[in-house]
Amino acid sequence: MSSKTRPVLLAKGKKLHLPNHIAIIVDGNGRWAEQHGLPRFEGHLAGIESVRSTIRCLNQYQIKYVTLYGFSTENWNRPKYEVMNLFRLLEEIVDKESQELHKLGVKIRHLGRLEELPQGLQQAINRAIELTKNNTGMTLSLAFNYGGRTEILDAVRAIIAEGVPPQSINEKLFNNYLYTAGLPDVDLIIRTGGELRISNFLIWQASYSEYYFTDVLWPDFGEKEIEKALLSYSQRQRRFGGL
């Protein structure tokens, strides 16, 4: 990575201890639209631009794993027209952006109950996964129709269905039945939009994660906020239960 393409933080020569896996709770699209006197759908459109810029910025920082929480299992309770419009937007964006991300060497995967999503979105996600499956750069996980409790329940059901002896069940085995199988635990969780909760997100994988909360709404989240989050993380001492 040449100095011309490095983010400002690295160009200043600061040495940082960067996270290996960053997960982001994308929040604030609707409120952003309301603040600007726009329909909520416009907030989602603006949020897509933040997704695009954030992925590219984190890729420049050489963050190996990035997970985006875009639609939870609880979000089905929102107005149907808003949910359907969001799905149509996601289908279009996944198809379009997967081509660009493929050029950057990004590997795409999905976390959640894919089979419950609309057929068109399922197909777009599967195309993106197939296109990028051999890439060795950043692994970008898209958590669409994801819920932490649902993930754990699905893992338990799969273990029971396979007849795994109880004495054989340990954390390592259990990890292999989660949606995130093969991914490392999350080092840093970023939540935009000012809420101070995890919203059923990666509750198994985030047992020792660091958190960064910001009042900035997702469409306004950019390189400066990423810099703040990484600086905050780098200044922390992670003890993992020790001294």
Predicted region positions:
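Flexible, compositionally biased loop and terminal segments
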Residues: 1-243
